[in-house]
Each structure stands twice: as C-alpha cells, then as structure tokens.
A protein has these predicted regions:
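Active-site-adjacent structural segments surrounding the nucleophilic cysteine of cysteine proteases
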Residues: 1-117
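Amphipathic alpha-helical segments that form well-ordered structural scaffolds
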Residues: 36-43, 122, 126-130
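Hydrophobic (often cysteine-bearing) scaffold residues that line and stabilize catalytic clefts
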Residues: 29, 33, 123, 175
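Active-site-adjacent substructure of cysteine-protease-like catalytic cores
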Residues: 125, 129-178
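Flexible, surface-exposed loop/gating regions in the mature catalytic domains
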Residues: 90, 108-120, 128-129, 138, ...
Length: 178
C-alpha cells in the first residue's frame, strides 16, 4: 500500500449534469474527461474564478451560454449521496462540470445512448489557459516511456499530492505539475 489521495467520488449524472446541454429533451452525461478534471480541480480547490473561459458553446447547432461566478469549493462535497446535499451544493458542482465541458470542447452524448467525450490535449490546454494551472500541465503517452520511467512519474505525482487524469485503455495521462 502506497499513498492514497482523498479525492471526490463524483460521476456523470445528477446532480453533476444539471447544467449540461439537453438534446432533444434528454439530459446528457458530463463526460468522463470533465468529471475527472473536476475531481482534480476540487482536490486543488483551484481556480477561484474563471476569467478566460468561453462565453458560449455550440452543441449540435444550439448555442448555450456559459457564465462564471467564483467557485465555492467548500460547497462541493466529496460525495453526493442522494438526499445528502443541498440545492446550492448541486448547483456548484453542476456549474463546474459545465464550465469544464464547454472549455474542453465536449462532444455531449444523451444518457442511455452514447457517452460524452473529450480529447486529452484539449483538457490539458484548458487546464493551462482557462483554469490557470501550471504551464507544465501536459498530456503524455505511455508508449513514449519505458515502464519503469512511467511508473516513477506516476508515483512522483502522487507523492507530491498531485492527482492526475489517467485514461484507459489508451494508458495516456495528463498531469498537473506545480
């Protein structure tokens, strides 16, 4: 047993998707990339507010407004069990998920059909340019590393209290470096 980072245990449906687009009257998933990114952002409680994000996002021909208010990280619990959270807590996490989705160019999918998807390079770029994370945030491929170096890099991130987005089965990772 190595070090374990205590991160949020969130998913892609209610209340997380309360602000994602509705397509043909049906709710959409937040997307695994947006959810994982939100969990990392909640762990870091950063940023305080977005000042460089998109103001609208087009999903299947419909423009959706994106408005930003300061994040209230303390109103985003690590767990959203049914009946255990307030409307304000639901609204806070839903806004975060929508902000991420719009800024990573999420391809939204309707619940029960196809999932919502995003590109890892778009996530890394949004973390750097929109959400004001370190310019060292990067998207890397396991195939570019020897196993020992890959394992060492991941262990170092965890040891430095830096959760990362890890994507399977491609075994690619976007890391947040201070």
């Amino acid at each position: 047993g190595g070090k374990v980072l205590q991160t949020a245990k969130w998913n892609q449906e209610e209340p997380y998707n309360n602000q994602t687009p509705v397509i043909n009257g049906k709710k959409t998933y937040t997307g695994c990339g947006a959810t994982a990114t939100a969990i990392i952002m909640r762990y870091n409680m950063h940023p305080d507010v977005v000042t460089k994000g998109v103001s609208s996002y087009n999903v299947r021909g419909v423009d959706y407004s994106v408005s930003y208010a300061p994040y209230q990280w303390d109103k985003m619990p690590l767990n959203y069990n049914p009946g255990s959270y307030t409307d304000e807590e639901a609204s806070q996490v839903a806004a975060l998920m929508w902000h991420i989705g719009a800024n990573v160019k999420m391809d939204y999918g309707v619940i029960g059909t196809v999932g919502s998807s995003s590109n890892g390079t778009d996530i890394a770029e949004a973390l750097r340019s929109v959400f004001e994370y370190s310019p060292a945030v990067r998207y890397v491929y396991k195939s570019d590393y020897r196993w020992e170096d890959w394992e060492k890099m991941i262990r170092n991130e965890i040891d430095q209290d830096r959760p990362m987005l890890y994507r399977e089965p491609d075994q690619q990772v976007a890391t947040s470096l201070s």
